[in-house]
Curated annotation (Swiss-Prot):
It comes from Syntrophomonas wolfei subsp. wolfei (strain DSM 2245B / Goettingen). This is 4-hydroxy-tetrahydrodipicolinate reductase. The gene is dapB. Keywords: Amino-acid biosynthesis, Cytoplasm, Diaminopimelate biosynthesis, Lysine biosynthesis, NAD, NADP, Oxidoreductase. NADP(+) binds at K39. It comes from the Bacteria.
Length: 266
């Protein structure tokens, strides 16, 4: 019988964390061995996610959990301030990482990439675990060959800490890598209110919306002479991310380097 991969989840009290606990607990090839959250007070995971038979209590010290449980994989859904140190601690002791937390900067990603190579363990940084979102990014990248003028609108729940989203950044990067030219700027354009034209990543404007009731949504809008093209993805429930989370956990165990974007594991 194939040995189950031993997994711990950091950020277990968050909305994505709770869904991830359920998904791992329900998968025959994965074993949930610990759950971590800085706000934890010893809660029972079984009570938290409504699955009986899990004898696991929430803990609040990730370094202790890594040392005591020696997992195969750390799944991180914490926050931009914690994720880098969490991943670095795990990689240093040979623990594979799946990072769903956005907010890592280029320097931090390079350091994690170097550490993964030194330790020969895989680390996956995934801006979006929804298969539909990955397809949206791929379609947008293809469309950019023919429609170089493009803007992105990303919409998320009002508790999301960072802007723009990792998905929007990744989409803009893929567009810039694939479009043959970048349109000239409108030099006469000016903002009556600072920031109203959005952020600019390689001449792709990104607009961030934060409202209660939303989960994760993105539109990529292309314009051309006499026509337009809109590519949109909507996540209506966090359960829609879970097939991707489970797949990435299993796939990253076969890698020995940093992987950025789920499309590179499909």
């Amino acid at each position: 019988m194939k040995q189950k991969a031993r997994v711990i989840v950091a950020g277990a009290l968050g909305k994505m964390g709770k869904e991830t606990l359920k998904a791992i607990a329900g998968d025959e090839e994965l074993e949930l061995i610990a759950a971590v959250d800085i706000k934890a007070k010893g809660e029972k995971v079984a009570d938290l996610i409504g699955i009986a038979g899990l004898d696991i209590s929430l803990e609040n010290d990730l370094d202790e959990v890594l040392e005591n449980y020696q997992p195969d994989v750390l799944v991180d859904f914490t926050n931009p301030q914690a994720v880098f140190n969490n991943a670095r601690s795990a990689l240093k002791i040979g623990v594979f990482c799946v990072i769903g937390t956005t907010g890592l900067n280029e320097i931090e990603i390079k350091e994690l990439e170097k550490l993964a190579g030194e330790k020969q363990v895989g680390v996956a940084i995934i801006p979006n675990f929804a298969i539909g979102a990955v397809l949206m990014m791929k379609f947008a990248s293809e469309a950019a060959k023919y429609f170089p003028e493009v803007e992105i609108i990303e919409l998320h729940h009002d508790q999301k800490m960072d802007a723009p989203s990792g998905t929007a950044i990744k989409t803009a990067e893929m567009i810039n890598a694939n479009r043959p030219l970048r349109p000239p700027r409108n030099v006469r354009e000016f903002e009556k209110i600072a920031g109203c034209r959005g952020g600019d990543l390689g001449q792709v404007r990104i607009h961030s919306v934060r409202l209660p009731g939303l989960i994760a949504h993105q539109e990529v809008i292309f314009g051309g002479a006499g026509q337009g093209l809109k590519i949109r993805h909507d996540s209506f429930d966090r359960a829609g991310f879970m097939p991707g989370v489970v797949m990435v956990i299993k796939k990253i165990l076969q890698r020995k380097e940093l992987v950025y974007g789920m499309e590179n594991l499909l």
